[in-house]
């Protein structure tokens, strides 16, 4: 499956025709902050600016959710994903769910 260029936030892929829509593919990751990470981030907030510990945690969670979405689309028989989106929800104090989802499709080169 999924060449990176065949995953898009748009609902079509230039140069390709969508032959079949297979349904929603999603990847979900639930992460919590460690005590050490929370302490380190608290120190960073004293100085303002980007909190790199949280940025790194968020980026890892998004990447993991993205890869899980690709795996699910592959299991569904898709070779592309359209309408890809991210969502994040704090489900408990310090615990965040990151969801990456889109429509798994079978796409072929147009022409």
From Swiss-Prot:
InterPro entries recorded: UPF0145_dom_sf, UPF0145_YbjQ-like
Family to which the UniProt record says this protein belongs: Belongs to the UPF0145 family.
Disulfide bonds: none
Superkingdom in the source lineage: Bacteria
PANTHER family in the cross-refs: UPF0145 PROTEIN SCO3412, UPF0145 PROTEIN YBJQ
Coiled-coil annotated spans: none
Protein name: UPF0145 protein BMA0904
Pfam families cross-referenced by the UniProt entry: YbjQ_1
């Amino acid at each position: 499956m999924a060449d990176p260029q065949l995953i898009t936030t748009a609902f079509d892929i230039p140069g390709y025709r969508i032959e079949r829509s297979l349904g929603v593919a999603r990847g979900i990751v639930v992460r919590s902050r460690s005590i050490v990470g929370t302490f380190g981030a608290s120190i960073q907030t004293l100085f303002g600016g980007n909190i790199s510990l949280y940025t790194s945690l968020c980026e890892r969670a998004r990447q993991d959710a993205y890869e899980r979405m690709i795996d699910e689309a592959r299991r569904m028989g898709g070779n592309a994903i359209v309408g890809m989106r991210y969502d994040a929800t704090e489900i408990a104090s310090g615990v965040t769910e990151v969801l990456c989802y889109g429509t798994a499709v079978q796409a072929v080169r147009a022409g």
